[in-house]
């Protein structure tokens, strides 16, 4: 399990609203080349999207669904296809009477079939990338996104 936390000088409601826009995840997650949201309407339990990510071996589509949605505090997701599938939870906590936020990520990559061989490598790569992406998220939100 990979965990990472970042503090952001924005209200939790604003942070969660930005995270809730699945099609904007490529603005702060550097491996994402594109996002296709497959479910119409606001994000909710059961919402699905496909991230096209640059991974070793070339671009790969990573389909996932939202499994928990508790605005403005928590969202969980899980991959639904592929040999290596993401699973995670993002929690947004208020700081300083709600004027700032702490964003905590719990994340893992689960191997299925042949993916059990690749998951440890992918997990190590994600452990290096996630802190950088969290910094980009902070910078993006604090600059007015």
Describe each model-derived feature in a short phrase.
Residues 12, 40-43, 68-72, 91-102:
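A short, structured loop/turn motif at beta-sheet edges
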Residues 78-132, 139:
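Beta-strand/loop substructures that line and gate deep hydrophobic ligand-binding cavities in soluble
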Residues 4-6, 37, 62-68, 79, ...:
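Hydrophobic/aromatic beta-strand elements that line small-molecule binding cavities or substrate pockets
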Residues 8, 55-57, 70, 81-83, ...:
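A generic beta-sheet turn/junction motif
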Residues 47-54, 75-81:
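Short beta-strand segments that buttress and anchor functional surface loops
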Residues 54-60, 111-114:
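Short, cysteine-centered beta-strand-loop-beta hairpins and adjacent loop/turn segments enriched
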Residues 1-44, 145:
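Hydrophobic ligand-binding cavity/cleft-lining segments
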